[in-house]
From Swiss-Prot:
<feature type="binding site">
    <location>
        <begin position="147"/>
        <end position="209"/>
    </location>
    <ligand>
        <name>ATP</name>
    </ligand>
</feature>
<keyword id="KW-0464">Manganese</keyword>
<feature type="binding site">
    <location>
        <position position="287"/>
    </location>
    <ligand>
        <name>Mg(2+)</name>
    </ligand>
</feature>
<protein>
    <recommendedName>
        <fullName>Dapdiamide A synthase</fullName>
        <ecNumber>6.3.2.47</ecNumber>
    </recommendedName>
</protein>
<comment type="function">
    <text>Involved in dapdiamide antibiotics biosynthesis. Ligates N-beta-fumaramoyl-DAP and valine, isoleucine or leucine to form dapdiamides A, B or C, respectively. Also ligates N-beta-epoxysuccinamoyl-DAP and valine to form dapdiamide E.</text>
</comment>
<dbReference type="GO" id="GO:0005524">
    <property type="term" value="F:ATP binding"/>
</dbReference>
<keyword id="KW-0436">Ligase</keyword>
<keyword id="KW-0045">Antibiotic biosynthesis</keyword>
<comment type="pathway">
    <text>Antibiotic biosynthesis.</text>
</comment>
<dbReference type="InterPro" id="IPR053699">
    <property type="entry name" value="Dapdiamide_Synthase"/>
</dbReference>
<keyword id="KW-0479">Metal-binding</keyword>
<keyword id="KW-0067">ATP-binding</keyword>
<feature type="binding site">
    <location>
        <position position="275"/>
    </location>
    <ligand>
        <name>Mg(2+)</name>
    </ligand>
</feature>
<dbReference type="GO" id="GO:0046872">
    <property type="term" value="F:metal ion binding"/>
</dbReference>
<dbReference type="Pfam" id="PF13535">
    <property type="entry name" value="ATP-grasp_4"/>
</dbReference>
<keyword id="KW-0460">Magnesium</keyword>
<keyword id="KW-0547">Nucleotide-binding</keyword>
Length: 424
């Protein structure tokens, strides 16, 4: 028996990482979901892409020809086109512009939302706090900027990438030149060659992730995360992220600044995921993505705050009037539950003897473990976010209990590295 309908369609491009939750979220509300796979599929997202193929009502593999893709979309009445991960942002902008969809961002600023150099230049142009930087395609350009900048450390990274891929913190000229050559010698996370390197001042302070949803130029902040990192061999490595919200210190300053950033970069509709450093002089953007947060589990925020980036994005797309009404309403989140992402940090490579999940899940407050290896695999040394062997998520009723849970997680992790791995 066949079923015919004229339902509006939600198009999701690269429903990977945090975006993998978008297809079931819209389908649960009765919407037909069409998934577009862009031209490059990073190896780390192969499993997520297979999940998107299985879940979606139709799957299209984009061959790089926009006109062909538009013709494939032509039979559908499209409600919205959404980027499911960072590499999809540019394609989503192109399709939204071609189809003149209203739930979209300012097309003229599309490049500034993806290119980290142009992003900071646009902020500086509009007088919004930004990073001192230089684009270098040759080592002489790097040396010239470093001589003029005259402050250490500095940050070198690709112009377009994801996570902490290819991000170096350099403390002297030798380290900077080595990082420069290392970045140029490899492709970025999305398979494009690095032909120039972004050189930036190092921001000292407390780092925050600021997540939210835009709708018709108004903004709802779903959650903030305070990020604790450590440096390993010149690389920034995530250690722990702590949930913050409206009643926590710094919320108003961080969100007011992020509104400025979104407005300056033309983020008027859809999800955004910003990394902001709270410096002694105030908040400064590290970078922002016009998409849902990568790797995020909406359960955590729903459990602690009663909403998530996924649920609020669906509301903004489907019921904008209700979304805007809730943006303007005062909410009391005092006493909200506390949560943390605890990232495993592997000190050295080793062959996995036994997986650690069962020991982690027994700790009070641990709700999930995402461990990336199986017995017999070689667990890699952690040098960035993508090489962390796993993440443990914890929820407790107050900060003291959460601190206790995190300490127990680190104890179990240390035992695992000592007893569960064989040196390679």
């Amino acid at each position: 028996m066949s079923i015919l309908n004229n339902k509006e369609v939600i198009v999701i491009i690269d429903a990977w990482s945090g975006g993998k939750h978008l297809i079931p979220a819209f389908q649960a509300l009765g919407y037909f979901c069409l998934h577009v796979q862009s031209t490059f599929l990073p190896e780390v997202f192969i499993a997520d892409n297979q999940l998107a193929i299985a879940r979606s009502d139709r799957h299209i593999v984009h061959d790089g020809n926009i006109e062909t893709l538009l013709s494939q979309l032509q039979p559908y009445t499209i409600k919205a086109i959404l980027a499911g991960s960072e590499g999809a942002v540019g394609l989503a902008d192109c399709l939204n512009d071609a189809l003149e969809l209203t739930f979209s961002n300012q097309f003229e600023l599309s490049a500034a939302r993806r290119n980290k150099y142009l992003m900071q230049e646009q902020l500086a142009l509009k007088g919004v706090a930004s990073i001192n930087q230089q684009l270098a395609g040759h080592s002489d350009e790097l040396k010239q900027w470093l001589a003029g900048h005259a402050h250490w450390p500095v940050v070198l990274k690709p112009i377009q990438s994801a996570g902490t891929d290819g991000v170096f913190i350099c403390h002297d000229l030798a380290q900077a030149l080595q990082a420069f050559e290392a970045i140029l010698a490899k492709k970025d996370f999305f398979g494009s060659p690095n032909r120039e390197v972004l050189c930036q001042e190092f921001l000292a302070g407390e780092e925050f992730v600021v997540n939210g949803i835009a709708c018709q130029g108004e903004y709802f902040f779903t959650e903030l995360w305070q990020s604790k990192k450590q440096q390993r061999n010149g690389f920034p490595v995530y250690e722990t992220q702590y949930l913050h919200y409206q009643n926590d210190a710094g919320f108003d300053v961080l969100t007011a600044y992020t509104v400025q950033v979104c407005q300056t970069l033309g983020i008027n509709n859809g999800a955004f995921h910003a990394e902001v450093m709270m410096t002694s002089g105030g908040p400064v953007l590290i970078e922002i993505g016009a998409r849902v947060a990568g790797g995020a589990d909406p359960y955590i925020i729903e459990e602690c705050l009663g909403h998530s980036q996924i649920s609020k994005l669906a509301q903004a797309v489907l019921h904008p009037a209700k979304f805007l009404q809730e943006c303007r309403r005062q909410h009391d989140f005092s006493g909200h539950r506390r949560a943390a992402y605890v990232y495993m940090i592997s000190p050295s490579p080793g062959r996995v003897q036994v997986s650690p999940e069962e020991k982690f899940i027994k700790i009070d407050g641990v709700i999930s473990i995402n461990y990336h290896y199986a017995p017999g695999d070689i667990q890699q040394e952690t040098c960035d976010l993508l090489s962390s062997p796993g993440v443990i998520i914890a929820i407790r009723d107050n900060p003291a209990l959460l601190k206790q849970t995190i300490a127990e997680i680190r104890d179990v992790e240390a035992d695992f590295y000592h007893l569960g791995l064989i040196d390679e």
